[in-house]
Amino acid sequence: MRPHYEDLANNLLSLGEEVRSVVVTSPEPGAGCTSVCLGLGAALAGMGRRAAVVDCNLENPQLHHMLGQPNFVGLTSGLQGDKPLEHYGREAVPGLLLVPTGPVPPDTATRLETRRFVEAVRGLERERDVVILDAPVAGKVLESPTLSRGFDGILLVVHASRTSRSAAHGTTDDLLDAGADLLGVVLNGWV
């Protein structure tokens, strides 16, 4: 799988320096967004780039599960505190910072619509070459002006055996109709 993620990283980097923050979403849960985020981040780090993966899926956080880590601190801690978001993550491998969601209080979804969230991500952009935002499903991204249009672009992950063509096409159309900058579609689960 590593060469596929390296290809994805090269394609992303070929878009230029103006692409610093990328939202990764899918038409439905289970398409493998978190895996794609981790693979892309590791590939970027392996190429000498400084990357960060931030779990923004507050309804169904997965990053800490995949890492076998507790979810005591992370994005939500950074949104409540005054320290940079980088402080609430950990360097998994040289060049790859991983920031889980942290504790998820009931009103957390609205916190992604705050200036503090955008400032926290922009702060990471100053420290990292690419910030990868592991987002909720596309329907939730479309409900969020910050996630759908507040960053440099969106990667849509579709799963080869789980995502129907109609769901993939419909979600692509919905994102484009909403004015999102769709950078590409990643086919996951195909070998």
Named regions from a protein language model:
Residues 43:
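Rossmann-fold NAD(P)-dependent oxidoreductase module
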Residues 36:
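Hydrophobic positions on the alpha1 helix immediately C-terminal to the Walker A/P-loop
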